[in-house]
A protein has these predicted regions:
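Conserved C-terminal helix/tail region of periplasmic/extracytoplasmic solute-binding proteins
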Residues: 363-364, 371, 375-441
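Extracytoplasmic "Venus flytrap"/periplasmic binding protein-like
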Residues: 58-127, 162-163, 261-262, 280-283
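Extracytoplasmic/periplasmic substrate-recognition and gating elements
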Residues: 237, 241-243, 280-352
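Extracytoplasmic/periplasmic solute-binding protein
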Residues: 138-146, 151-153, 178-227, 260-262
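Glycine-centered hinge/linker elements that transmit conformational signals in sensory
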Residues: 181-186, 218-249, 290-294
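Hinge/lid segment of periplasmic solute-binding proteins
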Residues: 97-152, 181, 286-295
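Short, solvent-exposed loop/beta-turn-alpha elements that line the ligand-binding surface or hinge
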Residues: 116-127, 172, 214-231, 237, ...
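Short, well-ordered beta-strand elements
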Residues: 27-39, 61-68, 94-95, 142
Length: 441
């Protein structure tokens, strides 16, 4: 990591100085930033900003000032309040982190810089294509990727190995959805407990259906085609058998209590996975948690959801915009970007960062869970295609209704199955038809 830091510093010193030949102003040009990385006091990004300010910032008379560190939801609301000139709203900063939904909700998207005006085609081509494309809105590069996460499979190896010794379960079974759900059904039969929890049922279907070569969306709704039925069958079978966690909340909780063995969740949730399981009887044990690439369908493409905010720059003056770009080019330079993301558990955003700097950085990591996560990142980036959702105004509504209704229908189906009088096969399709009827298209 020290070597990467030295490379990062050299990049800072080699960046071109703006206004060459002109007299430097006494006061630095200060540009402001709202971000989500850490807290006000303990933030890896704030530490890097301090380094920038004392090196290339000092050379070019630029100072980056962090005005707000919060969560993405709060920043979304604050940006829209400022853009709409709501009473009491703060002024927009020069830079803020954003999902596409924030840009789409702006009253005027033209208030944002188009990064194509400041980055050459070659510079933009250095980014992972899907990461860059997600930030292309209305034909403009409105969002610049900084960090990314994805969805990975977390497994409690201690519990899995204990059960596998008796059942014959294998880690290869965890590489496909068919295998995961078959294990979930078997585990429920053997132990009476859940095996698998997915944080994002909507994403399982969305990415899964697309990986099978079929469109998941149709117009402003969901297309319930043969691919959807293909994804529903093993999912519902495991749910009806009791092997799929159907409660609300995040996947970290049932793994923390031993109520599930395997989860699929955002890789960023690595922060919340514990190496101690506390059981309902208040006993506890140390466990080993590791990660693997997200499962795929046996006959499907290797497709996986990408996640994470990027950075928007607000139009102002050429000087202020150039100052922001100088900072962002530094932060996304491969060596610096790897130093940044590995302090947080995220993925870098350029191919060179993955190929040249990330493997070396992984060798320096000491936490086995993070070593496993970054090995999973490297495998995922090499073998998978990153998927990002379409830009739909009603996307969040479709997602929230889907998550609630899918769990509700399978929970009701599970009750019917336990009461008897219904076969599992019949309930698989009855729950699907009921779900489609209530959800709509």
């Amino acid at each position: 990591m020290k070597k990467i830091g030295i490379v990062c510093l050299l990049v800072l010193l080699l960046l071109p100085v703006t206004g060459c030949g002109q007299k430097k102003s006494t006061e630095p040009l200060t540009v402001t930033l709202w971000h989500v990385y850490g807290g006000e006091v303990d933030s890896p990004l704030n530490s890097l900003i301090d380094r920038f300010n004392s090196t290339v910032g000092a050379e070019q008379n630029i100072r980056v000032k962090v005005e707000l560190v919060s969560n993405s939801g709060s920043i979304h609301k604050s940006v829209l309040a400022a853009a709409n000139s709501d009473p009491g709203a703060p002024a927009l900063p020069d830079m803020f982190v954003s999902y596409p939904k924030t840009v789409l909700a702006l009253p005027d998207q033209d208030i944002l810089v188009d990064y194509r005006d400041y980055f050459s085609e070659e510079e933009l081509a250095a980014f992972i294509p899907a990461f860059r494309e997600e930030g292309t809105i209305g034909g403009r590069q409105a969002i610049l990727p900084l960090t990314k996460s994805t969805e990975v499979l977390f497994v409690n190896r201690t519990l899995f190995d204990r059960w596998a010794a008796q059942s014959g379960a294998d880690y290869d079974d965890l590489t496909t959805w068919e295998g995961v759900y078959a294990l979930a059904e078997q585990y429920a039969a053997d132990t009476g407990k859940c095996f698998f929890v997915h944080d994002y049922h909507f994403n399982y279907f969305q990415v899964g259906v697309e990986s099978l070569g079929e469109d998941f969306f149709r117009d402003d709704g969901v297309r319930f085609g043969s691919g959807f039925e293909r994804a529903w069958e093993p999912y519902a079978r495991a749910g009806l058998a009791g092997g799929l966690w159907l409660h609300d909340g995040y996947a970290t909780e049932p793994l923390r209590t031993g109520d599930a063995v395997v989860s699929v969740a955002s890789s960023a949730s690595v922060l919340y996975y514990s190496d101690t399981v506390t059981y309902p009887d208040n006993t506890s044990e140390k466990v080993e948690i590791t990660s693997m690439p997200c499962p795929v369908f046996e006959e499907g493409d290797k497709l996986v959801m990408q996640r994470g905010v990027g950075m928007c720059t607000v139009k102002s003056t050429p000087e202020r915009e150039s100052a922001c770009i100088t900072f962002l080019k530094w932060l996304t330079e491969p060596a610096c970007n790897v130093e940044f993301v590995t302090s947080l558990g995220y993925m870098p955003v350029t191919q060179e960062a993955f190929d040249r700097y990330l493997p070396e950085a992984v060798e320096k990591l000491s936490d086995p869970l993070y070593v496993s996560l970054y090995e999973t990142y490297l495998q995922t980036q090499e073998a998978y295609t990153f998927y990002y959702p379409p830009q739909m105004e009603n996307y969040l509504d479709l997602e929230s209704r889907f998550e609630k209704l899918a769990r509700l229908k399978l929970t009701a189906g599970r009750t019917q199955y336990l009461e008897g009088g219904h076969t599992q096969n019949a309930l698989i399709w009855e729950t699907l038809n009921s779900f489609k009827l209530d959800y709509g298209t």
